[in-house]
Structures are given as structure tokens and as C-alpha cells.
């Protein structure tokens, strides 16, 4: 008895392959974090191994991205070693019609925002379930917080109408700790009518390092979809 392929995985694989095909030889590539981006990193490594690509350099946004890139033979550099990033490819937890994003399900949004903002072209790879009419519809806003400021930041976001919850680890006791050594609050808002304003307001709270709202950064959204049971990719630009 054969198991039917997972439709979500099929969509992610299709969009990962499409994104990896956008990378050209000699490019400096921002390597995002997450399940879809992990597949894209694998596709990049396969293109390198086949000789379809040469002399690319990756800028990882997390420990996970770094490990995967090394596993698939992608040379890595830091921001100190490059003058620019040609393109960044990253996932998202939500995408609204204006191409604003919520990111940070992998607790890597601080580094992701740095790398994605520096890229000449920021490509977002998602499956169709991540498209929403308004940010905050299905996913809370991740907020990275200095550990000593956790309590006052929770009070501040509550005054803004948010419902903060400390993200706890899986397969470990205690909270999730970011690559920077900080904690993450997942903040649920009833509505986010102005993502740009909320992004600024959250970042102005003392003790907040960065939040997962990304405004005016994404240039292209590649959406994995199923049509008649077959995976396809739709571009929003």
C-alpha cells in the first residue's frame, strides 16, 4: 500500500525549486530559516553539485540555515565579508495583500530582518495557506526580548491591546532562546490594521530587540498551490 504524497510538502517543494532557480552564479544569497527555505537550500546545493551554479555565497539567518548550507556544500560568509546581498530567499508565517509579512515562527526574525533588508531582491516562499487578508489573522507577532526586560515588555504590549505569551521550548524545559540569547513573546492582536505603525511601536518598547512584522521589504512572493492535484507556483510581484 503506497502512501499518498503530502500536498503541503508538494507545494513547498515546488516553490523551493522555483526560488532556487532564480539564483545565478556569483550571487550572494541570504538564506532564510524555516521548512520551505530548508528545501530551497537543498535545491541550491543540488544545483551546485550538478554544476548548474558556481561561486555563490550564502549569508545564513540562523544556526539552522548555517548547518543546512554546510550540509549541502554552500559556501558561507558573514555580513562583514560582503558589500551587498544580491537576493534573499525566506519564508513567512503570514503574507497580506500588500506583501507585508509576519515572520518568526522559527525565532530567527531578528537576523532575518537584517539580511532581508540588505538584499537587492527579497523573495518570499510560502504555500497558499500563508496568504491572509490582514496580518495577525492566524499567527501571533513574535517579539524578541532581552531576558531582564521580559516582565515590563509583557506589560507594555498588554497596554497596546496584545496578549503576550512566552514561547516555550519543545523537547526541552523552559523558554525558547534565540541565537542571540534572548526570549520570544508571541503576541496575539485582535486586528493589525496598520502593520507599519505596530512594527515601530513594538520596537520602541525598551527591552524589545526586534519583532516579526516585515513591512515594505518583500519584492516577490512565490506561492505554492495545488491545481487539479498537481503542485504549481504563482508569483505575486
UniProtKB/Swiss-Prot annotation:
Kindly state which reaction or reactions the protein catalyses: aldehydo-D-ribose 5-phosphate = D-ribulose 5-phosphate
The cross-references to CDD domains, in alphabetical order and at most eight, read: RPI_A (cd01398)
Question: Does the record bear Isomerase in its keywords?
Answer: yes
- Keywords in alphabetical order: Isomerase
- State the superkingdom: Bacteria
EC numbers listed for it are: 5.3.1.6
Family matches, as SUPFAM superfamilies = D-ribose-5-phosphate isomerase (RpiA), lid domain (SSF75445), NagB/RpiA/CoA transferase-like (SSF100950)
A Gene Ontology biological process noted in the UniProt record is:
D-ribose metabolic process
Q: Give, as in the UniProt entry, the pathway in which the protein acts.
A: Carbohydrate degradation; pentose phosphate pathway; D-ribose 5-phosphate from D-ribulose 5-phosphate (non-oxidative stage): step 1/1
Q: Gene Ontology terms, cellular component aspect?
A: cytosol
What InterPro entries does the record tag this protein with? NagB/RpiA_transferase-like (IPR037171), Ribose5P_isomerase_typA_subgr (IPR020672), Ribose5P_isomerase_type_A (IPR004788)
- Which Gene Ontology molecular-function terms are recorded? ribose-5-phosphate isomerase activity
Name the residues annotated as catalytic in the UniProt entry.
112 (proton acceptor)
Q: How does it assemble?
A: Homodimer.
Q: Which NCBIfam families does this one have?
A: PRK00702.1, rpiA
Q: Which family does it belong to?
A: Belongs to the ribose 5-phosphate isomerase family.
Q: What is this protein called?
A: Ribose-5-phosphate isomerase A
Query: What organism is this sequence from?
Result: Cyanothece sp. (strain PCC 7425 / ATCC 29141)
What taxonomic lineage is listed for the species of origin? Bacteria, Bacillati, Cyanobacteriota, Cyanophyceae, Gomontiellales
Amino acid at each position: 500500500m503506497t502512501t499518498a504524497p503530502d500536498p503541503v510538502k508538494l507545494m513547498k517543494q515546488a516553490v523551493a525549486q522555483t526560488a532556487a532557480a532564480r539564483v545565478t552564479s556569483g550571487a550572494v544569497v541570504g538564506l532564510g530559516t524555516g521548512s520551505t527555505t530548508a528545501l530551497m537550500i537543498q535545491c541550491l546545493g543540488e544545483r551546485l553539485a550538478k554544476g548548474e551554479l558556481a561561486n555563490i555565497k550564502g549569508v545564513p539567518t540562523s544556526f539552522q540555515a548555517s548547518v543546512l548550507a554546510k550540509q549541502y556544500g554552500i559556501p558561507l560568509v558573514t555580513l562583514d565579508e560582503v558589500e551587498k546581498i544580491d537576493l534573499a530567499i525566506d519564508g513567512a508565517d503570514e503574507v497580506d495583500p500588500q506583501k507585508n509579512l509576519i515572520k518568526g515562527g522559527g525565532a530567527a526574525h531578528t537576523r532575518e530582518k537584517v539580511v532581508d533588508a540588505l538584499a537587492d531582491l527579497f523573495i518570499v516562499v510560502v504555500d497558499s495557506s500563508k496568504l491572509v487578508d490582514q496580518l495577525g489573522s492566524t499567527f501571533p507577532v513574535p517579539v524578541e526580548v532581552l531576558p531582564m526586560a521580559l516582565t515590563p515588555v509583557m506589560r507594555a504590549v498588554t497596554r497596546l491591546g496584545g496578549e503576550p505569551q512566552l514561547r516555550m521550548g519543545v523537547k526541552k524545559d523552559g523558554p525558547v532562546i534565540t541565537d542571540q540569547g534572548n526570549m520570544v513573546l508571541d503576541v496575539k492582536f485582535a486586528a493589525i490594521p496598520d502593520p507599519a505603525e505596530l512594527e515601530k511601536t513594538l520596537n520602541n518598547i525598551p527591552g524589545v530587540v526586534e519583532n516579526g512584522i516585515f513591512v515594505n521589504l518583500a519584492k516577490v512572493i512565490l506561492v505554492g498551490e495545488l491545481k487539479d492535484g498537481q503542485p504549481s507556483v504563482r508569483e505575486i510581484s
